Protein backbone atom coordinates (compact mmCIF):
# COMPACT_ATOMS: atom_id res chain seq x y z
CA UNK A 1 0.00 0.00 0.00
CA UNK A 2 1.20 3.49 -0.86
CA UNK A 3 0.87 6.00 1.97
CA UNK A 4 -0.85 9.39 2.08
CA UNK A 5 1.68 12.14 1.31
CA UNK A 6 3.57 10.13 -1.32
CA UNK A 7 4.57 11.90 -4.55
CA UNK A 8 3.66 9.99 -7.70
CA UNK A 9 4.03 10.37 -11.47
CA UNK A 10 1.24 9.42 -13.89
CA UNK A 11 2.71 6.94 -16.37
CA UNK A 12 1.02 8.17 -19.55
CA UNK A 13 1.73 11.91 -19.38
CA UNK A 14 4.28 12.37 -16.58
CA UNK A 15 2.02 14.60 -14.45
CA UNK A 16 3.11 14.81 -10.80
CA UNK A 17 0.62 14.29 -7.99
CA UNK A 18 0.30 13.83 -4.25
CA UNK A 19 -1.60 10.92 -2.68
CA UNK A 20 -4.31 12.51 -0.52
CA UNK A 21 -6.44 9.51 0.47
CA UNK A 22 -6.30 5.71 0.27
CA UNK A 23 -9.48 3.62 0.10
CA UNK A 24 -9.65 -0.17 0.19
CA UNK A 25 -12.26 -1.59 -2.18
CA UNK A 26 -12.81 -5.36 -2.33
CA UNK A 27 -9.21 -6.07 -1.32
CA UNK A 28 -7.70 -3.52 -3.74
CA UNK A 29 -6.43 -0.05 -2.93
CA UNK A 30 -7.75 3.02 -4.73
CA UNK A 31 -5.71 6.22 -4.42
CA UNK A 32 -7.15 9.75 -4.47
CA UNK A 33 -4.47 11.97 -5.96
CA UNK A 34 -4.22 15.75 -6.25
CA UNK A 35 -2.51 16.40 -9.59
CA UNK A 36 -0.31 19.32 -10.62
CA UNK A 37 -3.19 21.12 -12.34
CA UNK A 38 -5.16 21.15 -9.06
CA UNK A 39 -7.59 18.40 -10.03
CA UNK A 40 -8.36 15.34 -7.91
CA UNK A 41 -8.78 11.90 -9.44
CA UNK A 42 -8.87 8.36 -8.12
CA UNK A 43 -6.88 5.60 -9.74
CA UNK A 44 -5.24 2.25 -9.14
CA UNK A 45 -1.49 2.06 -8.58
CA UNK A 46 -0.87 0.49 -12.00
CA UNK A 47 -1.44 3.93 -13.56
CA UNK A 48 1.31 5.75 -11.65
CA UNK A 49 4.78 5.26 -10.16
CA UNK A 50 6.12 6.43 -6.81
CA UNK A 51 8.79 9.13 -7.09
CA UNK A 52 9.25 10.15 -3.43
Language-model region placement:
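Basic/aromatic-rich interaction segments and small domains that mediate binding to polyanionic partners
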Residues: 3-52
Amino acid sequence: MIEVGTLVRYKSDGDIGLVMKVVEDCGHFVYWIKWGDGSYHSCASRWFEVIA
